[in-house]
Amino acid sequence: MAFQDFDKIQERVNANRKRKFRKRIIVGTVSLLVVVAAIVGGAFAYVAYEKRNEQQQQQQQAKNHNKSGSGNNVVKDSDKKSPSPPTPSQKAPVSAAQSVKPGQGDKIIQTLCSSTLYMQICEKTLKNRTDKGFALDNPTTFLKSAIEAVNEDLDLVLEKVLSLKTENQDDKDAIEQCKLLVEDAKEETVASLNKINVTEVNSFEKVVPDLESWLSAVMSYQETCLDGFEEGNLKSEVKTSVNSSQVLTSNSLALIKTFTENLSPVMKVVERHLLDDIPSWVSNDDRRMLRAVDVKALKPNATVAKDGSGDFTTINDALRAMPEKYEGRYIIYVKQGIYDEYVTVDKKKANLTMVGDGSQKTIVTGNKSHAKKIRTFLTATFVAQGEGFMAQSMGFRNTAGPEGHQAVAIRVQSDRSIFLNCRFEGYQDTLYAYTHRQYYRSCVIVGTIDFIFGDAAAIFQNCNIFIRKGLPGQKNTVTAQGRVDKFQTTGFVVHNCKIAANEDLKPVKEEYKSYLGRPWKNYSRTIIMESKIENVIDPVGWLRWQETDFAIDTLYYAEYNNKGSSGDTTSRVKWPGFKVINKEEALNYTVGPFLQGDWISASGSPVKLGLYDA
């Protein structure tokens, strides 16, 4: 072994020590807050006492370390340093009602903010609120304060966007789109605040998946707002405002992660992906619906048929007739036929199920495209926004062809959405898995460039993914995941799927290089595991974004236990962000932990919560 290898090992050892030290300090800080909260009673007093002993040991270690002449600063990035982690008060709590000592609030803020990417802004945000009388009584009040700052900043973004003046129609469209997206973002932050307001500290971990999903969506909405503007003065004006709210959102997500990691050992909360209770949003009707084979057994609320044999002849007419308030799941049965219409299931239409006669029998089709000067975001044939949307045995198409360039068949931003035995056909940008938690089972997805893209937390399980023939000279990419921040809980997981050439590509596949994906945004995250990858995929596996080094250090691309002629990872890219993972790491991206998949299994949909080789 070379001498420089010993140096690298020592650097890693030192870095691990620093990380462990900081984690212990944060654990102690959060434990102290929990005790002060007066919610958890005497059990937490004992835990805090144990933490106090651990903190005293760490404090003594820190003193000894400083005497030796080296500091205990933690380096987060090459150009960004955090101050030495402060040590919370060592005095054990005498009672649960005890208040925090003067000056201790600042130390706690510093400690909690040390886990964020934008530490100084985090400290300033929380400090400003404590100065205004913000109560330092439990961990969730810190988080609430951080999210309130996001919500207030979004008001400023909206104010800025509405003040913009232009005569250019493209810019006007971008302004209108951004306005709607900022309003969507505000809805998510308000929902997050409402959730925190009704949650006790000892139940906090149960609501974390919702908070992470909603705030991750806020990040996506902010980014899409910016993407809508062409480069120029107008975009620069908006970018300054939007970037500010993105920073605050990132800090909120980081604080959630900090509290989750450090409340778990304190409170022994049940693992969120192994809940014993069936979630309240899943009804018995949902389970019967997804288990049903005969559509007549569904007892739909409305039937759509082009031949007039149903209640409506168009899907949109059926949606307009759906009651504004409906208890339980509302089912629309769409009979065989090609429905040439643009459909939006808006946010008010929650818990809606659409069932067709088959993915190649009941088809919703359109042909909007970027080539027709339509924004990619608005080209979707079908849009699913309402929470809890389910589709079974349906087909979704965009027939713009390869000449249409970006042309979306479906855009999904419905939280806890399920697609079972569905088919998605297009070329570039076929399936826009935009935001929130999504599950696709036994589906067929067909396209050319970035044909599964977006910033959702989405798992594709037991699906057939077919790469088709595009324009001459084009390179095909299956995925283009758009995670913009390391604390977002989003990403794509392709699990036990088949990736192969479509029939039209097979004879000429040597003329079209195809790849598993490319990084659309800085923290793009895609995992391909336990899948069959046929020889349509280039041995390097992954493609750079427009032949640059963009995101190759910050992305997370992983493969685990794949098979097929292109499943061999020997010749894969040598990027810092790509890795071949082991079983332990792969488990993190199964349905259970990644989507908190109890809601899927409770719905009656077939699902594999863990690995197939377990």
Swiss-Prot record:
Pathway assigned to this chain's UniProt record: Glycan metabolism; pectin degradation; 2-dehydro-3-deoxy-D-gluconate from pectin: step 1/5
Disulfide bonds: 443-463
GO molecular function annotations of the record: enzyme inhibitor activity; pectinesterase activity
Membrane-protein topology: Single-pass membrane protein
Localization (cell): Membrane
Residues carrying the site annotation Transition state stabilizer: 428
Region called Pectinesterase 13, residue ranges: 301-598
Transmembrane segments: 25-45
Listed GO CC annotations: membrane
Coiled-coil parts of chain: none
Tissue expression summary: Expressed in flower buds.
EC number of this enzyme: 3.1.1.11
Region feature (Pectinesterase inhibitor 13): 103-255
PANTHER family: PECTINESTERASE
Protein name: Probable pectinesterase/pectinesterase inhibitor 13
Gene: PME13
